[in-house]
Amino acid sequence: CFAVLLLEVQGQGMSAKVVALLGILVAMNAVLRFVESAVPGPGGFSPIFLLIVLGGYVYGARFGFLLGALTIFVSSILTGGMGPWLPYQMFTAGWTGMAAPLCRPLVRALRAEGKAGEAAVLALYGGLWGFLFGAVMNIWFWPFVSGPAGQYWEPGVAFFEGLRRYAVFYVVTSLAWDAMRMAGNVVFILAMGVPALRILRR
């Protein structure tokens, strides 16, 4: 997976400046995640999504995906957090950055470029991904655990029944945890979004 990401960086004609910036942002986020693992915040509260969201928003979907995926990979080396969950973390963090440019039309419609409204739109986006990140992450282990009937996957379960069971499982096991991630994303983007965007656009 890491080799594919490196080939993507080399094969897409990224300028040396953009590749260097990608490396710097990945390193910054990896250090933030290392600190986060040493001094954990409440629930899923994490500072790393600030740069993933803003980087993808400013530099595009490919840059955002690489920033998210490489952040998770490099930080997992620092924290020793490698396991079967790692590909899910990498792809989901990558998707968080990759989809960030979808906020651009709304920002333009609101004429909020460079203003607090731009950060507000991105904060709402980051908040949504606070929940989506956890919802995708749970899939790596949900089919392999067992518990109360009506919450877990079983062979032969119909598609919509599986969705219903997963929704119940998510609410019971993860909603409160992911709400902390959502809150962290919103707080960091609202507090630092405008100056951070200004720096990234230089």
Regions found by a protein language model. Give the residues of each.
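Lipid-exposed faces of alpha-helical membrane segments in multi-pass integral membrane proteins
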Residues: 2, 24, 28-31, 70, ...
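Generic transmembrane alpha-helix motif of multi-pass integral membrane proteins
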Residues: 6-8, 48-64, 99-103
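Membrane-interfacial loop-to-transmembrane alpha-helix junctions, especially the N-terminal start
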Residues: 15-22, 60-64, 196
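Alpha-helical transmembrane segments and their helix-entry boundary regions
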Residues: 64-68, 122-123
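Hydrophobic transmembrane alpha-helices
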Residues: 1-54
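Membrane-embedded alpha-helical hairpins and interfacial helices in multi-pass inner-membrane proteins
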Residues: 38-47, 82-87, 104-202
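Interfacial aromatic-anchored transmembrane helix boundaries in multi-pass membrane proteins
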Residues: 31-47, 70-104
